UniProtKB/Swiss-Prot annotation:
Keywords: ATP-binding, Chaperone, Nucleotide-binding. InterPro entries: ATPase_NBD, Heat_shock_70_CS, HscA_NBD, HSP70_C_sf, HSP70_peptide-bd_sf, Hsp_70_fam, ISC_FeS_clus_asmbl_HscA. The gene is hscA. Chaperone involved in the maturation of iron-sulfur cluster-containing proteins. Has a low intrinsic ATPase activity which is markedly stimulated by HscB. PROSITE patterns: HSP70_1, HSP70_2, HSP70_3. Gene3D superfamilies: 1.20.1270.10, 3.30.420.40, Actin, Chain A, domain 4, Substrate Binding Domain Of DNAk, Chain A, domain 1. NCBIfam families: HscA, PRK05183.1. Disulfide bonds: none annotated. This is Chaperone protein HscA homolog.
């Protein structure tokens, strides 16, 4: 007999008229999804109660894949087809990731963003990220019981335009409507500020698996104003792993290049466990058997680890000092330092932050969850679910200056870094030669003075300029950055009115045709995805049915005679065996058989409960 499920008081889903939106922290190591439910932001766990989804995708033959925990478990045995830390490759070209430390992948030499060859074909970081985002989307829709109107996705504050566009492309591929790209430190400040009614100057120190950000924020009466942001989009907890990895190999006299890819991934996984153990113990041990039978046994002290990673710790303080200078404040002006990212659990980080700012950091919110919670608050607001206490304002900034190439390969900055967004700025330029009728406009991003040292974002031409003497034409170039930190550029010749514009699709972004092809490919694999999803749902329901039956037998097994008990036990055993297979229909059939086979038992339990409730009571009391 099927039983209806009723939620606890106050925990029922929000009313149907509420527009469902979520916050997603797309992390290097782990990703999370959160939503505001009953006016409280909360992280949404999977069916096993796990909040964190490992940012790992394993590709199989014939279009299959495993995502999250299942993929992570196979990373050491199938490293070439199991993509980890893909966030480090977002918006990056092959030349920029070629030296990726100990990466076991085969990078493909293709124009634009780096590609990775797998057993299921060549994949871009956008496609891999889309798999993770889609998994979080399904989790949210299953938990909330309806489709999402959109999501706020967090990105490192120091992500450039190419990396932001790649993130937005991944969301589009995953079927998500992006309400806003939100800087991770800002999201953390929202969660922390609203949770603690904080005011004053705060620093958000965000060290994740692959990126580092430091933001200075001013919180006053519901206004979150980012004064400055700095960071390093190629520095994170992974780098601490690689330093420890190198030390372990050096102590053992092993050349990393001589290791099989499987051993590299196995060692990196074990080294990460070792690093985490050193966060709570003065020393920790490593015991690994490699594929060739060689055994590595080492004990490393926390002091040794601290000295090994000291250069990385100092690398985080360099952009910290820069951000403080940009905000024109000193460490003494900072009221509190909020730690974000799992890597900030390392004592060596907490000690360095405390020493630099002269105060212990704030750690009352989970550093793994705080970004997703802040994004959920912003998503709920952008979806139109404004409630009491929601009259707050967010003022974010761009992390890197935007400029245009001028003669001689120089950069003229149009919008300086740390400008509040959204923003539009314009500047006039002129022609270089007599009779010049066209102008090439090269859009760049960065702080250096030479174009060669900055990132190229886009190129376009303004044609139809009336022929004039050099310096007579007036071309007004306008840069416009939206709330996501994405750029559009417009050029207009003032005399003739001729115009040209470009919505910046970075050199390492994806063309619309590429997105369309990926969407088409995703449709082709949709059946595989749905089968995998149906199988997982059937297995979860089977396990629920088995546990419910066993609990009932423990409580009221005496209601069955020996023959009936034997029959129920056989049905449970059959379902347990079938649930380990991959036939969803067979699992559903076996689950139904157990449900049908225990109908009479359920009825007897109900009768017993009623009799117990009525025992000793008179008719007129009922």
């Amino acid at each position: 007999m099927a039983l209806l499920q009723i939620s606890e008081p106050g925990m029922a889903p929000a009313p149907h008229q509420r527009r469902l939106a979520v916050g997603i922290d797309l992390g290097t190591t782990n990703s999370l999804v959160a939503a505001v439910r009953n006016s409280v932001p909360e992280v949404l766990p999977d069916e096993a109660g796990r909040a964190l989804l490992p940012s790992v995708v394993r590709y199989l033959e014939k279009g299959g894949r495993r995502i999250g925990h299942e993929a992570k478990e196979q990373a050491a045995t199938d490293p070439r087809n199991t993509i980890v830390s893909v966030k480090r490759f977002m918006g990056r070209g092959k030349a920029e990731v070629e030296g990726a430390a100990n990466a076991p992948y085969e990078f493909v030499d293709a124009p634009g963003m780096v590609q990775i060859r797998t057993i299921d074909g060549v994949k871009s970081p956008v496609e891999v990220s889309a798999e993770i985002l889609a998994t979080l989307r399904y989790r949210a829709e299953d938990t909330l019981g309806d489709e999402l109107v959109g999501a706020v996705i967090t990105v490192p504050a120091y992500f450039d335009d190419a990396q932001r566009q790649a993130t937005k492309d991944a969301a589009r591929l995953a079927g998500l409507n992006v309400l806003r790209l939100l800087n991770e430190p800002t999201a953390a400040a929202i969660a922390y500020g609203l949770d603690n009614a904080a005011e004053g100057l705060y620093a958000v120190y965000d060290l994740g698996g692959g990126t580092f950000d430091l933001s200075i924020l001013k919180l006053t009466k519901g206004v979150f104003e980012v004064l400055a942001a700095g960071g390093d989009s190629a520095l994170g907890g992974d780098d601490f792993d690689h330093v420890l990895f190198g030390h372990v190999l050096a102590q053992a006299g092993i050349d990393a290049k001589a290791l099989a890819p499987e051993d590299v991934r196995l060692l990196l996984d074990r080294v990460r466990v070792l690093k985490e153990a050193l966060s709570s113990a003065p020393q920790a041990s490593l015991d690994v058997t490699l594929s060739n039978g060689a055994r590595l046994v080492q004990t490393i002290s926390h002091d040794t680890f601290a000295s090994l990673v000291e250069p990385l710790v100092q690398r985080t303080l360099t952009p910290t000092r820069k951000a403080l200078r940009d905000a024109q404040v000193t460490p003494a002006d900072i009221k509190g330092v909020v730690l974000v990212g799992g890597a900030t659990r390392m004592p060596v980080i907490r000690d360095a932050v405390a020493k630099y700012f002269g105060q212990p950091p704030l750690v009352n919110l989970d550093p793994d969850q705080v970004v997703a919670l802040g994004a959920a608050i912003q998503a709920d607001l952008l979806a139109g679910n404004r409630g009491s206490g929601d009259d707050w304002l967010l003022l974010d900034v761009i992390p890197l200056s935007l400029g245009v190439e001028t003669m001689g390969g120089l950069v003229e900055k149009i919008i300086p870094r740390n400008s509040t967004i959204p923003i539009a700025r314009a500047q006039e330029f002129t022609t270089f030669k007599d009779g010049q009728t066209a102008m090439a406009i090269h859009v760049v991003q960065g702080e250096r003075e030479l174009v060669a040292d900055c990132r190229s974002l886009a190129r376009f031409e303004l044609r139809g300029i009336p022929p004039m003497t050099a310096g007579a034409a007036r071309i007004r170039v306008t840069y416009q950055v939206d709330a996501d930190g994405l750029l559009s550029v417009f050029a207009r010749e003032q005399h003739s009115g001729v115009e040209a514009s470009v919505v910046v699709k970075p050199s390492y972004g994806l063309a619309d045709d590429d997105i369309a092809k990926m969407l088409e490919d995703s449709f082709k694999t949709a059946e595989i995805d749905m089968r995998a999803r149906a199988l997982r749902e059937a297995q979860v329901e089977a396990q629920r049915m088995i546990e419910a039956t066993q609990a009932a037998l423990s409580a009221d097994g005496e209601l069955l005679d020996d023959a009936e008990r034997t029959q129920v036990d056989a049905l449970v055993a059959a379902l347990r065996t079938i649930a380990q297979g991959d036939d969803a229909d067979a699992i559903e059939t076996a689950t139904k058989a157990l449900a049908d086979g225990t109908d009479e038992f359920a009825a007897r339990r109900m009768d017993k409960s009623i009799k117990r409730a009525l025992s000793g009571r008179r008719l007129d009391e009922i």
